[in-house]
Amino acid sequence: YFNSSLHHMSDLDAILIKRCAALKQDGYLFVNEYIGPNRFTFSDREKEVMQSVFHLIPEKYRVSHAEHDRGQIRKQVHYPDPAEVERVDPSEAIHSEEIVDSLKRHFKIEEFNYTGGTLMQFMLLDIAGNFKESDAESMQILQLIFDIEDTLVASGGLLPHFAMIIARP
């Protein structure tokens, strides 16, 4: 079982070869993982979609809860700087976009389920606390974001960044 750990591995093939050898022939490998761009190096298209959807959120739900800008209305999505990601944690998302291909080389994928977060991971960073179940409007906005993301991923307009995968040797 890999739970948000494979994206930290520098030698995916070596790790997966060992796991494949360790599993019984009728065994299963379960993976819950970030499979998006290495070190969060988003494409211009991904950034454009995130920013466009972000601007659909009314200002009252874009109030930051982050310490450095608490109470201020966010005007744009704050994307991580890949160089800073590498500096802070050299293993963070080092080969994340290669996980699925590496799994396919060593396992038979039985199930692949996109789990959301392609747009929302950074789009809702520090503002997610503004969305409360007791606020029907905020729930409608969240549902709209879920629907846009799900539709774009299902149609191939965006690649999934998170997935649950079941594989066999």
What are these regions (language model features)?
Residues 1-13:
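A short SAM/SAH-binding and catalytic strip from SAM-dependent methyltransferases
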Residues 6, 36-37, 115-120:
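Short, solvent-exposed loop/turn segments at secondary-structure junctions
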Residues 10, 24, 104, 108:
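Short conserved AdoMet
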Residues 13-28:
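A short glycine-rich, Lys/Arg-flanked "PGG" loop and its adjoining helix->strand segment in the class I
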Residues 28-71:
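Conserved class I S-adenosyl-L-methionine
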Residues 61-131:
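Substrate-binding/catalytic lobe of Class I Rossmann-like enzymes that use SAM or dcSAM, i.e.
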Residues 105-169:
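C-terminal lobe and adjacent flexible extensions of AdoMet/dcAdoMet transferase-like proteins
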